[in-house]
Amino acid sequence: MTTTLLLGIAILCSASVVPDSDMPLKNSPTEPLGYIDTLSIQESIVRSNFSSDAGSPLRLKTLDKETLSFRGASRTYPELLNGIPSLYATSESGSYGDAKLNIRGFGQSNIAVTLNGIPISGLVSGNMYWNNWMGLADATYAIQVQKGVGSSFLTDGSVGGTINIVTEVPDEKFEAEAGIYGSFYGTVKAFLKIGSGNLPKGWSVNLMASYVGGDGYVDATKVNSFAYMLNVCKTLGTDHKLIFTALGSPEQHEQRGTRLSWEEVQKYGLRYNRNWGLRDGQAFNLNLNNYFKPYFTLQHIWRGERFSMKNSVYVTVGNGGGRWSENKSTPILYRSKDGLIDWDGVIATNRETEDGQALSILSDYMAGHTYFGAISSMEYRLDGGWTIGAGIHYQYYSTWENEKISDLLGGEWWYEDYEHTSLAGLASRNPVKTVGDYIRTDNGKVTNHGTAYLSAGWRSEKVTVNFGASVFGASTRRWDKYNYYGGDVWSPLAGGVGGSIKAGALYKIGRGHSLYVNGGWYSRLPYSNVWFASGNNEISRDVKNEMNAMGEAGWRWVWNSGALELTGYASLWKDKSLMSNAYKVENSLDVKYMVTGLDAFHCGVEFEIRQRIADWIRLSAFASVGNWKWMNDVSATIYDHYSGNALGDINVYCAGLPVGDAPQTQIGADLDIDIPAGFGLNLNWRFNNRMYADFDPVTRTNPDDRTPSYRFPSYHLLGAQLSWTRRKSHPEDVGCRIFLGGNNLLDSVYIERGKDGASHNLESFRGYWGFGRNFSFGLCLSF
């Protein structure tokens, strides 16, 4: 009843209101679904546009540079997108840089991410590690969120949607920008951007550098990150352009890696982090992450009167890891009276062992990859409103990971129990290890992935139709020097073929009204961590392509001072595969099992409305209501890793359980007021409800337990930002913007993320609570 009332209030309050600058109102041409020219680089460097918000058969939302700057202080990159219906982004654990994103109830592995038209989601699990892209917010020109199928045929992960990111390149004139953002709890960001404008012989250069440092909101979560971006553009004649981009963000940040109980939050507060303590009088965090992922692209864009082509090559080499711990029995449990790790107690215990063997140690868990690829896409405009397109994409992805002892914590040596941790057994290896020695893991994967597509589109004054199909194939091999020491370290080849079909149509009724419909079908290959889910070179049994069928229909109404959009969607996700945690089988060691054939159904309604009430006031509101559930119970067979013999069957009972990890009801509103003398005020309100704790379906093995995972209490968030802006009226002027913002002004206590417990209630739940009331500030100068 409360949700229905709030939804009604949101719609009524905004019934006479609608869009602002981040919802373009002009009916610009729409690119065909197959053509992935998502760049809109200052309209002159690259004529490759985002899909038009007003003329596309997709549910879109575009955030421009000014909007992103307005939201950017002390937030992770995905959090810039909050306020879009059915999208939920948080900092995950509260650590700076760690973030998590859901769209329409689907997690990151079902959300495609492209950067300047190039897919950047990982091929191992489909996830995005946003801390590897910390500086991206300062280099972004615009972001477009495409719900559902998306416009790209070069990514096969767009089930929830696609995030298209476009970085800045030089404009025609010289420009420079510098600024400093910060939070009152200690995080500070400084940045500098310089654009050369047009230089002789068709050259232009853009440079960005930024730094983030200081304390996070959560205790002992310092951050130290530098970011850079270089763009060099060369115009060749009237139709050709070359764009070279280099960007990266070497970073180090402390983390909160352990979820909290409600009892701990009540006792120690929202900032509590149980992963640190004092060591030699200094704060010392058990979890410290560092990573550097330099990224390079070279793009050639040829745009003629009828024929257009875009060619891209890219390469990135990632390297980094994090502080880890290994223990002989239980994790580090020594606690001081204030709930922190008692490092002195841990060290004393290691020193008291008779033979000097360490019971607990620290290690560096390292991971890296080499990732390169090439894309070629083309489009030809025919007579009669027809357009045809085609493209190919090749990706090579090689990963590695290992673990190295970094600190014996007062001990003299560590015993590596090869007999129980390695499939090869001892294999003549020395089990006595010390600082600098490798333990526990030394493996990686090599994946080759290729995609090809064909598309077509037809457009008249009132009708737009787009359709196309793609085929993709991949092969993966895994190597493991730890489990197969002294033998063949390579696995057999795993892989397969998949495909997709997409189509969309829009009809302009007249007077700003239009109706649209789109749909798609995917047969998506398993990610490499599904093929090799058991931690060794054995290929997972009975794994099939995931099938995704989705569709949406909507009504869009655009008028001079506003816009309204209403969309209904449905997505069927079939044959999901999940690997269980360790499971005890009678007369056998703990084993894992692969659950296949899980199905889920996501459907819902989204509403958004915006209105410029007067020249000085704008009001917008949105609402989304979803119904996301697991559909079926499934069975799994447990196999012995050594013999391959079946050990037994196990059943998983998920039918009818709500999907967790994102709110199924969202309502929000924004009020923007222009005050005389350059001042501006933004007020924003968000309401989240019907959010269930995340859970692993494979843990639901009790046929009598059909209780949904823990349902979080609903909550309201109120924010505000006061700004003063002095715009440039002449090229010689200096523009200035100063702002002061506040988040969670009501100081609401709410849960952002977490895992369900055995009792499916607050007592057994473990998770992360949101930030309390906090404030941010910023100063930005433009030249």
Feature locations, PLM:
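Surface-exposed extracellular loop regions of Gram-negative outer-membrane beta-barrel proteins
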Residues: 258, 475-482, 493, 506-552, ...
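Short, acidic, small-residue-rich periplasmic hinge/interaction motif at the N-terminus
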Residues: 17-69, 108
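Gram-negative outer-membrane beta-barrel transporters
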Residues: 459-462, 568-572, 593-697, 780
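Short strand-turn segments of transmembrane beta-barrel domains in outer membranes
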Residues: 149-152, 162-198, 209-219
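Signature of Gram-negative outer-membrane beta-barrel scaffolds
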Residues: 387-510
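Conserved C-terminal beta-signal and adjacent last beta-strands/turns
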Residues: 247-249, 506, 517, 549-551, ...
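Extracytoplasmic beta-strand/coil segments of soluble accessory domains associated
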Residues: 57, 78-119, 135, 141
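Short acidic/polar hinge/loop motifs at secondary-structure boundaries
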Residues: 100, 119-147, 166-168, 271
